[in-house]
Every structure is written in structure tokens, then in C-alpha cells.
Design a protein with these regions (language model features):
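C-terminal membrane-exit region of the final transmembrane helix in multipass inner-membrane proteins
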Residues: 2-4, 11, 380-418
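Peri-transmembrane interface segments
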Residues: 16-28, 239-297, 306-308
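Short helix-loop junctions at transmembrane helix boundaries
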Residues: 329, 344-389, 400-404, 408
Length: 418
């Protein structure tokens, strides 16, 4: 292949000369198609990965990657209690790649002001006791999205979303009554100390965050009784493996009060959200296939023009004894320079555009429709490498068949015509 590469290189650098300028427009079109295709594919992959990570993070922030709950629960926020000891938390937090574990308790209710009311999910978290394996607690998620005030520090303090704040005209410092209905109506007075905004409207409009002891008091639970345990992990791709380990340690086993424990991961808790996210993968495949088809068509056109533009050269080499395989390899090498050049520029432009969006959030989005306020970007160098290697290999494979036109070029006819 050394001779083929050398000849292809000389032909490539001769393309700007006067006698080769007839083929330059077609080559530039093919080059542009490769560049545009690479830019679109890179942006598509990084945006989809970023969007999925944002949604996964927000869903996990309101719940967790894995939850340990009572086996008798019926998938509502009015949960049967389980007894959670410190030793149980330590057994789970000792699992590799677990970020933190924490008790939680939830209870549906109604928030009422003088002029309006709103159904809520009150989620209680410990204010100062958590067994952690890296991150202090589940409050960290809300710290990142807090836009006013601070996190709760006392038993009667809560944070609400900006959606709920606007709807009910409540601000930091406002007090309100929440009503919880069982056999009889129970009320609690809370003071708002913080307002968060995750742009995830399905959850923002419902969740009020406060002290876990409020739910324990409302339900008449003891100190060790809670709705469940949140288990957050560091790497979402390890969810199945870690879930299996959590199940092996506590799944279908009784707690200290005889309640059987059950584990469920974030996908089981939110099947609709994750089914929707899976559809995004299909969109990526469709876009990549379209870009490959468009770029492939232009690359094939460029190769054919390169061959037809060099028929005299091909005829001379055939007359000197060069076989068809040798000549096809020359032009495949020459086409590879075009592909590599286009991919290089496509990567440079695509990565620059992604970096601008990542750091400066140039393109905004409507959070009520997309759950994020700007186009999210996540750099995933594994998929980036797969994309580049795959694009190059596919581009070269689709050129093998068109290069067979060289076998139909007769040196006698070409030299006679010239």
C-alpha cells in the first residue's frame, strides 16, 4: 500500500492546479457534505445525551436511583412504613459506587392560602442525620436549583417551587397551612424559607420539601419508621448492577418490625419518562442514517468525478502494467484524504459549537415544553470516538463498489481519444 499512498498523496496535492480546477467544485460539495454531516451528528449525540442526563438527574433528585420501600406499597405517595436502622443504611452505603443513602417519608396533602389551594406531595428528609458515601444528602439536588432563600433548618420550615410560588402568590417568609386527610383532617403550619426551580413542571407543581419528622408525626410513626430509603449512585450506567446488589442485601427480607422490604429503581418508578427518553435514541439513529446517506451520496459523486477527471492517468498506468486493484486502491486512498479532511473540519466546528452552548447557553428552550431552560450538552468521548471511527469505516466501505468503474476504463480507447 506504500506506493498507492504515495501516488494518492501526489494526486491530492495536485488538485489545486489549473488543469484540475474543473473537478474542484464537485470536490468542495463532497467536502462540505462531510463537514455538515459530522457537525450535525456530533451535535445530535451530545445534545441527546445531555438532555437524557438532565431529565434523569431531575427525576432522581425528586426521588432516587433506587428506593427501598415496604413490599405492601401500592405505588402511591401514601406509603406503608418500614423500620430503618443505621446498620441497614451502612450495609447499603458500603456498596461500591453508591453515592449516598438516606431515609425519606412522603405524604399527599393540600396547601391552602386565603385565595387558592393546591394539591401537594410533602416529602420529608432528615435535616441533619444521613449515612453518606460521598455526598452529604438528598438536599444537594435542591441546593443546585435554589433561586431564593435557603434550605430548611427547623421542623416547620419548607421549600416550594417557583411554579407553586407564582400560582399561590407565596414568597420566602410566607406562612401557609397544609391539610392532610386520613380518618380526620390534620393541619400543619409551615414557613417558606426557600424557592427552587428545576424547570421540571410535572414535579415542581407538586413537591414541597421539609423535615421528615413532620410526616412521622402526622402518621403516628416511631423515630425509626419511614416511607423508605433513597439510594443514589454515582454512575447511571451501573444502575442494574448496583440494584442487583441492593436487592441481594435487603430485597424480600424483613426489617426489625417484620415488614418485608422491596427495592425498585428509577425506571420502574417512572416508566413513562424513561420510555419517552428511549424514543430519543431512535431519533439519533434516524438523523445519523440521514447524514450518512447524504454525505455518502456526495462522497460517491466526488470519487466518480476524481476518477473521470484522471482517465488519461489511469490509461497510462494500465498501459504500463498496473492492475485494476492497484488503481482502485490509489483512488480509495485519495478519497480517504477527502473524508479525513471533512471529518477533521466537522469535528472542529461541531466541538466549538457544542462548547459555546455548554458554557454560554446560547440557545434557550421553553422549560414548560422541554423541562430545561436551554439546550443541554454532555460531552461523551466514548460515543464521539465510535462516531468518528464508524463514519470513516462506513464512508470507505460505500466507496468500494463505485471504484469498480476503473475496471471499465480501456487504456487503448483513452490514449486513442487523447
Amino acid at each position: 500500500m506504500r506506493n498507492e499512498w504515495m501516488i494518492a498523496k501526489r494526486l491530492y496535492y495536485a488538485e489545486g492546479k489549473e488543469d484540475k480546477k474543473m473537478s474542484l467544485p464537485a470536490i468542495r460539495v463532497a467536502l462540505t457534505a462531510i463537514i455538515v454531516g459530522m457537525v450535525v451528528m456530533i451535535i445530535t449525540i451530545f445534545v441527546v445525551i445531555g438532555f437524557k442526563q438532565e431529565i434523569q438527574q431531575k427525576v432522581a433528585g425528586f426521588g432516587s436511583h433506587i428506593q427501598i420501600v415496604n413490599f405492601d406499597n401500592n405505588n402511591t405517595y401514601e406509603m406503608q412504613p418500614i423500620s430503618v436502622s443505621d446498620s441497614l443504611l451502612e450495609r447499603i452505603s458500603s456498596i461500591e459506587d453508591v453515592d449516598y443513602v438516606q431515609r425519606f417519608a412522603t405524604k399527599p396533602g393540600m396547601l391552602k392560602t386565603d385565595s387558592a389551594f393546591q394539591g401537594i406531595i410533602f416529602k420529608g428528609l432528615p435535616l441533619n442525620d444521613s449515612v453518606s458515601a460521598g455526598s452529604p444528602s438528598g438536599w444537594d439536588f435542591f441546593t443546585d436549583y435554589l433561586i431564593k432563600g435557603h434550605l430548611p433548618k427547623a421542623q416547620n420550615e419548607v421549600i416550594i417551587s417557583s411554579t407553586m410560588s407564582d400560582l399561590l402568590n407565596l414568597q420566602v417568609g410566607s406562612a401557609f397551612f397544609a391539610y392532610f386527610i386520613e380518618e380526620k383532617i390534620r393541619s400543619r403550619k409551615f414557613t417558606i424559607v426557600g424557592i427552587y426551580n428545576t424547570c421540571f413542571s410535572d414535579y415542581d407543581k407538586s413537591f414541597v420539601l421539609g423535615d421528615i419528622r413532620q410526616v412521622q408525626s402526622l402518621n403516628g410513626w416511631d423515630e425509626d419508621e419511614v416511607s423508605g430509603v433513597d439510594v443514589n449512585i454515582r454512575d447511571f450506567s451501573e444502575l442494574d448492577r448496583i440494584h442487583d446488589k441492593v436487592w441481594m442485601r435487603v430485597g424480600n427480607k424483613p426489617d426489625e418490625r417484620g415488614n418485608f422490604l422491596y427495592t425498585q429503581d428509577i425506571r420502574e418508578q417512572n416508566p413513562n419518562v424513561f420510555s419517552w427518553l428511549e424514543l430519543l435514541n431512535m431519533n439519533v439513529v434516524i438523523i445519523i442514517l440521514l447524514m450518512v446517506c447524504v454525505a455518502g451520496f456526495n462522497i460517491i459523486s466526488g470519487l466518480l468525478i476524481l476518477i473521470l477527471d484522471a482517465v488519461q492517468f489511469i490509461g497510462i498506468l494500465k498501459a504500463l502494467g498496473a492492475d485494476n486493484g492497484f488503481l482502485r486502491r490509489i483512488f480509495l486512498c485519495r478519497a480517504s484524504f477527502l473524508v479525513i479532511n471533512g471529518m477533521l473540519w466537522g469535528n472542529v466546528i461541531g466541538l466549538i459549537l457544542c462548547a459555546l452552548q455548554y458554557y454560554f447557553h446560547v440557545i434557550p428552550l421553553d422549560p414548560t415544553a422541554y423541562y430545561v431552560s436551554y439546550v443541554p450538552i454532555a460531552f461523551h468521548w466514548g460515543w464521539w470516538s465510535v462516531l468518528n471511527v464508524g463514519t470513516f469505516l462506513v464512508s470507505m466501505l460505500i466507496l468500494v463498489a463505485p471504484s469498480a468503474i476503473i475496471t471499465r476504463i480501456s487504456p487503448a480507447k483513452v490514449m486513442h481519444f487523447e
